[in-house]
Amino acid sequence: MVDLNGISPKNKGYYVALGLEGSANKLGVGVIKQFVDGSPTEIVSNIRDTYITPPGEGFLPRDTARHHKNWCVRLVKRALAEAGVTPGQLDAICFTKGPGMGAPLHSVVIVARTVSLLWDVPLVPVNHCIGHIEMGREITGAQNPVVLYVSGGNTQVIAYSNQKYRIFGETLDIAIGNCLDRFARTLKIPNDPSPGYNIEQMALKCKNKERLVELPYTVKGMDLSLSGILAYIDSLAKDLFRKNYSNKLLFDKKTHEQLVTVEDLCYALQETLFSMLVEITERAMAHVNSAHVLIVGGVGCNLRLQEMMEQMCMDRANGHVYATDERFCIDNGVMIAQAGLLQYRMGDYVKDFKETVVTQKFRTDEVLVSWRD
């Protein structure tokens, strides 16, 4: 059993951490308490502000960084006030080291360094992916599941072994969230609250579910490729908008009647992408002899993905799917605080400010998970 109490807490019986997340367009600040006796983590503040662009547009690093720079200090003040915590009570300040977009990461780490010096509180650099996993484990109570990590920047199937989160399969090109977001831009649907959520809602309106539009399905062993399916469905959407009657898949050859709607395309995209995810996840479960799946990351909020994963798990003895809602699936500060405080309690925190340099590339399996057996 790992001893997590090697460093004494400032507060009697519990540790307090401030978490700062800003690797993409979500800026999250959270405050948590972890207890010496091993009681469940208490989330005392979880605030988020999202940089939202107009329909049909993505978010540029420089604009996202400007948003984070303008809002980060205000969110820190709000989070501490909401939590009823003073800077003197903080055991650690945790920030996202990577992976993510360079400029937004820099905006947030500058705030983390500044308040660390002002308040004389240790800094803890956190891997974004590890934050998702540890928050998911804490909220759901999942002990040792296969993890499906699906977000705008990452698509990985992960399992724990020998103090590392090992990657068993991943995307070979773009992430699933990026695929959904880019298709949403093609359709020019709103980015509020998120493109993926709006695609999910459009898919629910599909009236031709028995006539699934056939899309490329590219699974290569434990890995998958998503750029081909995006290019193909983009071309279908553009033909639909241009009313390209020569496309026999979309229009009747004789009457030019429209056979496929935008909602049909959204439904087909979700069904195909999620089927690929279920396949590689089940393969990983068989490999490590696990019956449990934990879904984390922004795309993990999708109820259809959760439903398809549950259907797969029903065929396995004692199969179970663990998932959280948008408070914890979508990027947030408390997940960084959760993973960071575990690191801090094992003595893993910044001794030299050179260790606070952020990075756009930081793989899940690079981190020593010292707080687990």
UniProtKB/Swiss-Prot annotation:
Q: Which CDD domains match?
A: ASKHA_NBD_OSGEP_like_euk (cd24132)
The family classification in the record reads: Belongs to the KAE1 / TsaD family.
Name of the protein in question: tRNA N6-adenosine threonylcarbamoyltransferase
Q: Does the keyword Transcription apply?
A: yes
Annotated keywords? Activator, Acyltransferase, Cytoplasm, Metal-binding, Nucleus, Transcription, Transcription regulation, Transferase, tRNA processing
Q: Reaction(s) catalyzed by this protein?
A: L-threonylcarbamoyladenylate + adenosine(37) in tRNA = N(6)-L-threonylcarbamoyladenosine(37) in tRNA + AMP + H(+)
Where on this chain does substrate bind?
Answer: 149-153, 181, 196, 200, 302
Positions bound to a divalent metal cation: 128, 132, 149, 331
Any Pfam family from its record, for instance, is: TsaD
Which GO cellular component term is one of those annotated? chromatin
Q: What is its main location?
A: cytoplasm
What this chain does, per the entry, is described as: Component of the EKC/KEOPS complex that is required for the formation of a threonylcarbamoyl group on adenosine at position 37 (t(6)A37) in tRNAs that read codons beginning with adenine. The complex is probably involved in the transfer of the threonylcarbamoyl moiety of threonylcarbamoyl-AMP (TC-AMP) to the N6 group of A37. KAE1 likely plays a direct catalytic role in this reaction, but requires other protein(s) of the complex to fulfill this activity. The EKC/KEOPS complex also promotes both telomere uncapping and telomere elongation.
Cofactor(s) for this UniProt protein: a divalent metal cation
